[in-house]
């Protein structure tokens, strides 16, 4: 894959607290460690990975509007259950995306089991901890490679 391929990684509210926030649900790895490992994985595939974590919905929306990425990996965190605006931003740019969650949202409280994104996502990965991000990146690379072959 050429170096012009770009993937945008977005992480929503409270994910800056990974490693110390409810490690029973979210694991012990920090977001910085996860992003570093993903950056290495992307670099090995000759792909550019841009990352933004924000607790502010509008910053995530602005990043989606401004991106020239060919793929988005998003962990909307608590916005999963509340943000029609973030959903509309993703639909508005028509960039394929994968939704990632560290915990198994389906095994948690009922309010966490609804997503405004999953019906529009290329795929959803949940419950696999930090490993889920790596699987999402692999799936994104595979999707982009398949798309390139079809062109």
UniProtKB/Swiss-Prot annotation:
It comes from Shewanella denitrificans (strain OS217 / ATCC BAA-1090 / DSM 15013). PROSITE patterns: DEHYDROQUINASE_II. InterPro entries: DHquinase_II, DHquinase_II_CS, DHquinase_II_sf. The gene is aroQ. Catalyzes a trans-dehydration via an enolate intermediate. It holds the Pfam family DHquinase_II. Homododecamer. Substrate binds at residues 75, 81, 88, 102-103, 112. This is 3-dehydroquinate dehydratase. It is an enzyme of class 4 (lyase).
């Amino acid at each position: 894959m050429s170096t012009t391929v770009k993937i945008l990684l977005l992480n929503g509210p409270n994910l800056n607290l990974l490693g110390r926030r409810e490690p029973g649900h979210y694991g012990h790895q920090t977001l910085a460690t996860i992003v570093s490992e993903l950056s290495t994985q992307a670099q090995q595939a000759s792909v550019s990975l841009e990352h933004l974590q924000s607790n502010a919905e509008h910053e995530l929306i602005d990043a989606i509007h401004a991106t020239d990425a060919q793929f988005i990996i998003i962990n909307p965190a608590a916005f999963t259950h509340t943000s029609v605006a973030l959903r509309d931003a993703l639909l508005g740019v028509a960039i394929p995306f994968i939704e990632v969650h560290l915990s198994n949202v389906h095994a948690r409280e009922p309010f966490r089991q609804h997503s405004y994104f999953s019906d529009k996502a290329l795929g959803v990965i949940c419950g696999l901890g930090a490993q889920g991000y790596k699987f999402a990146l692999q799936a994104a690379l595979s999707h982009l490679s398949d798309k390139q072959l079809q062109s």
